[in-house]
Amino acid sequence: MSVSAFNRRWAAVILEALTRHGVRHVCIAPGSRSTPLTLAAAENPAFIHHTHFDERGLGHLALGLAKVSQQPVAVIVTSGTAVANLYPALIEAGLTGEKLILLTADRPPELIDCGANQAIRQAGMFASHPSQTLSLPRPTQDIPARWLVSTIDNALAMLHAGALHINCPFAEPLYGDMNDTGLVWQQRLGDWWQDEKPWLREARRLASDKQRDWFFWRQKRGVVVAGRMSAEEGKKVAQWAQTLGWPLIGDVLSQTGQPLPCADLWLGNAKAVTELQQAQIVVQLGSSLTGKRLLQWQATCEPEEYWVIDNIEGRLDPAHHRGRRLVAKIADWLELHPAEKRKPWCVGIPRLAELAWQRVVAQRDTFGEAQLAHRIRDYLPEQGQLFVGNSLVVRLIDALSQLPAGYPVYSNRGASGIDGLLSTAAGVQRASAKSTLAIVGDLSALYDLNALALLRQVSAPFVLIVVNNNGGQIFSLLPTPQSKRERFYLMPQNVHFDHAAAMFNLRYHRPENWEELESALAGAWRTPATTVIELVVNDTDGAQTLQQLLAQVSHL
C-alpha cells in the first residue's frame, strides 16, 4: 500500500466535495505536510488557484475574494504556526459573515505532544471563533469514502456564515508516484464524480418571517440606520427609506449614497439629537457602524422598538435595545416589508446636513488628509470599486464624504484591525477584475507590506493610496497622555514607500498638490497595473480638521 497515493485520494474527495458547495477560489501557501491537499486542488479544473508565501496575508486574500464573490473560499496551509497565522482573517470572517474553508494540514496523532518538529495542538486551536470545526482522522481505507464526503457536506450545509476549520492529519510519506492504492475505495462514490451536486443535500432555513405588525410600524415616525451591506442592497434601502419619509443615517459601507451626508458631524448637534428623539422606531439594516457620534446616538436613543436586520446570526446591538433581532438577507427582508408612501417627518436634519456639507466643502482646497477623504468620491474609477482601510482614514471618509449610491465599497470593519488590509484589497480586486481604489494609512501599509507581492499581477488598474501622516494619528482624537502620546501611541516611523514599490516593481508617485494627484490617477486608470500613490500629509492636520468641523457643526 502507498501511503502517499492514498493521502492524495483522500484529499481529492475533500476538494471535490468543496466544489459542490460553490467553492471556486483556493488560496494556497507553500508547505510539505499540505502536499496531498495542494496537489488535489492543483489537479481539480474547477478551481482558480491563488498562492502567497505569507499565511496571514493568504487568509486575508481569501477574505477579500469571499467579500466580492459571496461564495465560500478555501485556504490550504501546512502544519504548525502556519495555521495560527490564519487567526486574524478567521476572526474577521466570523464578524462580517464571509465564508472561509480553512484546510489545515497536520501531523498524525502519534507525533503530537512528543517533541516532533512542526507539530502543535491544532485541533480546536481557534477556540470559539470558527462557525464550524471538523477534525478529520488520519486517512484510512477502513473509513468509507461516503463517510468522508457526507461529513464535509454536513459541515458546509451547517455553515451559515464565518469560517469552517477542517484539520487534516497526514502521515508520511507525502511524496511518490500515484498507483492503484485506494482506487476502489474512491470509486465506491460511483457517478458522484461526474455529478455536480453534494453527496448529502441538507436544507437549512435561516431567515426571519414577515413581521405581521409591519403595516402598523411603517406609519410611525421611524429612523433608518444603514450599516454594511451590498451595493444593490444599499440602493434599495435608500429608496425604501425615502418612500417611508424616514431619515436615513448611512454608514460609509452602506452604499446608500448617504442622502444625509456628514452624519458624524451633525449628530454632534443637539438640535439633531432632539429631533431624532421623536422617532418611535429605529430600523437598523446591516451592522459594523463606523461613526463615533452615530454609535453614541445609537447607545442613547430610546425608541419604542429597535430592529436589527442582518444575515449574520447573533446579537449585533452593543446598546442592547428592546426590540427585534431579525436574521435575513437585507434585500429579502425589504421585499417582505414594503414601504408605504409618506411625507418626511424629520425636517430640521436635512438642513443641518446641508450646512455641515457646506462647511466641509469650504475646506476642500487645502492639500491634506481630511480634504482627501472629502474628495475621494471624485477619484473613484468608473464602474470600479473602493476598498477603505481602518483607523483614521475610514472615519474621515465616513464623516466628510458622500459616496455614490450603489458604488461597491469594501472594508474590514468586523474586528477593525489594521492587519491584512492590503491582502484583503488584493482579494477584492481578483474576485471582480474591476478597477480598484484602495486607501490605507502608513502604519496599515507597513503592517501588510509583503502583500505588495500580491499586487504585482492584476487584471485591471489598481491604485493604492497610502496616506502617510507618520504614525497612528487616530490617537490624536483620543485623550491619550500628551507626554506619552508620540512614543507609545502614535509611533511615527519616518519612512516613505518609494523603495517598497520599487522592490515589487510597482509604479509609484508622491504628489504634492491636487493637480499632481489627479494627473497620477488619470495615468493609473489607463493601465492594468498597480500604482502606489503616497500622500505625505501634515501629521495632525487630519485629526485637527475633523475636530474643528465637529465644533463648527455642533453650534449651527
Swiss-Prot record:
Q: Which cofactor does it need?
A: Mg(2+); Mn(2+); thiamine diphosphate
Question: Do you know which InterPro entries this protein is assigned to?
Answer: MenaQ_synth_MenD, MenD_middle, THDP-binding, Thiamin_PyroP_enz_TPP-bd_dom, TPP_enzyme_TPP-bd
Q: What is its EC number?
A: 2.2.1.9
Q: Which UniProt keywords apply?
A: Magnesium, Manganese, Menaquinone biosynthesis, Metal-binding, Thiamine pyrophosphate, Transferase
How does the cofactor attach, per the note?
Binds 1 thiamine pyrophosphate per subunit.
Q: List the Pfam families hit by this protein, alphabetically.
A: TPP_enzyme_C, TPP_enzyme_M_2, TPP_enzyme_N
SUPFAM superfamilies tied to this protein: Thiamin diphosphate-binding fold (THDP-binding) (SSF52518)
What GO molecular functions are on record for this protein?
2-succinyl-5-enolpyruvyl-6-hydroxy-3-cyclohexene-1-carboxylic-acid synthase activity; magnesium ion binding; manganese ion binding; thiamine pyrophosphate binding
Provide the catalytic activity annotation.
isochorismate + 2-oxoglutarate + H(+) = 5-enolpyruvoyl-6-hydroxy-2-succinyl-cyclohex-3-ene-1-carboxylate + CO2
Q: Which domain of life is it from?
A: Bacteria
How the protein assembles, per its UniProt entry?
Homodimer.
Q: What NCBIfam families does this protein map onto? A: menD
Q: Which family does it belong to?
A: Belongs to the TPP enzyme family. MenD subfamily.
Against HAMAP family, the record matches this protein to: MenD
How is this protein named in the record? 2-succinyl-5-enolpyruvyl-6-hydroxy-3-cyclohexene-1-carboxylate synthase
